[in-house]
Design a protein with these regions (language model features):
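Glycine-rich beta-strand-centered segment in the early N-terminal region that forms part
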Residues: 1-25
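Short amphipathic alpha-helix with an adjacent loop that forms part of the alpha/beta core around
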Residues: 128-137
Length: 257
């Protein structure tokens, strides 16, 4: 909720229910944010649910749609399909007419992502996502949170002209790549971090979310997936949930609890 406005800020009013894309420091009761990174929450969305929206939706929109340019009819491979990023990517890709291949680590998570619309679900502990992608003609876009360990396999999974966007390094910071394989697929690899983008880029991302994605949220076509909410004083418990990797969607700190 807006408590104060800086000089010259327009389009917002004290008392407005908003969500914001932060550069960090979100474990707080009050934050100061550039006005361009603050937007009204989608109609019908609770403040608690809205807390799960900015980081994940901005990450997916900026990388999958703005950078990689996913088109209707193309195939998206998203790793970690049951994560906050993954559940958002699946829903948005399907809403805009794309096919989705995703990886998960358990049968329970596989069931959830299928319900969200994933077309092909791969349990990475048992099956090969490269083969799964090849069976559907290859991935046009890969959204990768793993990094080094998956680099070569992501290239192998590409369709001709495919685009890989690396946004995480859970599988290491280094990977070996046969450039011939990338050349043969006429593929591209990008690596981005939302946190370190300049304020004007973040403002543009948030503006596009309001224009293109908020109507989908308000219509119930896509929604933030909340695994659990905890009060701020239980932040250590929230991190333990994430470390155990048993969650589906986002874990949110509830400052009103």
């Amino acid at each position: 909720m807006v408590e104060e406005l800086g000089e010259g800020v327009t389009g917002l009013a004290i008392g407005d229910e908003v969500c914001a894309l932060l550069s960090g420091g979100g474990y707080a009761e009050r934050v100061v944010v550039p006005a361009g990174q603050v937007v009204a929450i989608p109609s019908g969305t609770s403040l608690l649910a809205a807390g799960a929206v900015p980081e994940t939706f901005a990450t997916v929109w900026s990388n999958v749609f703005m950078l990689a340019g996913l088109q209707p009819g193309e195939t998206l491979l998203v790793h970690g399909g049951a994560s906050g990023i993954g559940t958002t990517a699946i829903q948005l890709a399907k809403a805009f007419g794309a096919k989705v291949v995703t990886t998960v680590g358990s049968a329970d998570k596989a069931e959830v992502v299928r319900e969200l619309g994933a077309d092909v679900v791969v349990n990475y502990r048992e099956d090969d996502f490269v083969e799964a992608c090849r069976e559907v003609g290859g991935a046009d876009v890969v959204l990768d949170i793993i990094g080094g360990r998956y680099l070569a396999r992501n290239v192998a999974a590409l369709a001709r002209g495919g685009r890989i966007v690396v946004i995480g390094m859970q599988g290491g910071v280094k990977g070996e790549l046969n450039l011939g394989a990338l050349l043969g697929r006429q593929g591209t690899i990008s690596a981005t971090s939302l946190r370190f983008r300049p304020a004007e880029e973040k403002a543009e991302i948030m503006a596009q979310l309001v224009e293109h994605v908020w109507p989908l949220v308000e219509a119930g076509t896509v929604a933030p997936i909340l695994h659990r909410s905890l009060p701020l004083e239980q932040v250590a418990d929230a991190h333990r949930i994430l470390e155990e990797s048993s969650h589906v969607g986002k874990v949110v700190l509830d400052l009103g609890a």
